[in-house]
Amino acid sequence: MAVNNYDAVIMGHSSFKLIPMDNEIQLNFLNEEIDKLVTAIEEAKANGSHQNTAVVKLLERSKKAVEKNVKKLTDIKRDQGITFDKLGVDYMFVDEAHEFKNLYTYTAMSNIAGVPQARSQKASDMYMKCKFIQKSGGNVCFATGTPITNTMAELFTMQRYLQEEELERLNIHNFDAWAKTFGKVITSLEVSVDGSGFQTRQRFNKFFNIPELMNSFREVAEIQTESMLNNALENSKLQRKRAIPPKHVGDKAKVVSIEPSPELEDYIANVVERTEAIHNSAVAPYEDNMLKVTSDSKKASIDLLSLIHI
């Protein structure tokens, strides 16, 4: 790539992440991340609530983890060979861009449902490479059918990738500023995970200024809805009629409810006991946890036989 004049180079996500960035660029990126963490820690401390004590500890652990990565890079003395920044990439098209949605967000709202907290190395790697291309005068294009899958907060991640300069112009320097501008945390009663009662839960799920948010996002987004795509297929000479997605009878899915078997009712009671034990720290996380409970419950809802370990 570095010594040839290709029109395009196509590679899979797995191959892309194997191309490293120059250590110096990585160090600058990580130091910027540390600055963001310091700001988030200061804001969490300024809040002063008992609830934010746990948030501060979480952010400080994240800061130490980033500082550890800085030390690792600083200790590397060997020649890296050809790195991504030396390949001369001036335009990057990323298909299935939702695969990189787990870009870690530094926030004082980490204990609130609806705020993304997942972090993946491949998302951080993609973000670093996107920023390098953009700062070098190049362009980045994302393509995905699911830019938002779990929460509206994922839109902030897409904006970080594609229009961070616009966020800076709007004085939105972090997720908390974005959340205050476009959303609100709501406290409400919800059915507990095991279904045995109710619990008070805070969720980031009320939004406002939506027209302004979408106008901002549409500066970088071309959005195609299902009906728009269906119309394009119907009017296309390249597509056959049978390529049109079939419609549900009555234009919507029909839910068929059935009574649980006695065995399933017994299993649900066991799920409640497991959940209580987990919440009371009566069981070690490696022995049982909510991820296992959720997975087992999904299997049981299909067929109890799927829980049998062969």
Language-model segments: what does each one mean?
Residues 2-43, 53-91, 99-101, 119-153, ...:
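Inter-lobe coupling linker of SF2 helicases/translocases
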Residues 113-118:
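Flexible beta-alpha connector loops of hexameric P-loop NTPases
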Residues 26, 105-110:
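Short, flexible, mixed-charge acidic loops at enzyme active sites
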